[in-house]
Regions:
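NAD(P)+-binding Rossmann beta1-loop-alpha1 motif at the extreme N-terminus of oxidoreductases
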Residues: 1-50, 55
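Rossmann-like NAD(P)(H) cofactor-binding subdomain of soluble oxidoreductases
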Residues: 52-54, 59-120
Length: 120
């Protein structure tokens, strides 16, 4: 599989690190999934990482639907509220990687979208 589009759900410390690492990859379309005030803030101010401001694309879950690779980097407690967004993003060939703490985030996500989408 060639990865051409990556969405990050959760632009905190871990998600920002992913954004930093992928921002220079010109052959990958990179976006952060957000809505409401968070989306507005990310669009206007970007993500500041080590004194550098990055401006990844900001997508709603529906705009991100069908990305090649979804990175879930939420705090564990936010996962139940994000499952509908994860479902909205996941297309037929989307691969999901959880970078969350806890030992069962992959299983929780798999119950919603199917284990075939999860990278273990």
């Amino acid at each position: 599989m060639i990865i051409k589009s990556v969405a990050v759900l959760g632009a905190g410390a871990v998600g920002s690190y992913v954004i930093w690492g992928l921002s220079e990859k010109k052959d990958i379309r990179l976006g952060v999934i957000a809505s409401g005030e968070r989306a507005k803030r990310l669009k206007n101010k970007g993500c500041k990482i080590n004194d550098t401001v990055y401006h990844p694309e900001v997508w709603t879950p529906e705009e991100a639907h069908g990305v090649d690779f979804l990175i879930v980097s939420l705090k564990y407690g936010a996962l139940p509220g994000a499952l509908d967004n994860i479902t909205a993003v996941t297309g037929e060939n989307t691969v999901i990687m959880s970078l969350m703490n806890g030992v069962d985030s992959e299983e929780i996500i798999a119950e919603k979208v199917g284990a075939e989408h999860l990278l273990h």
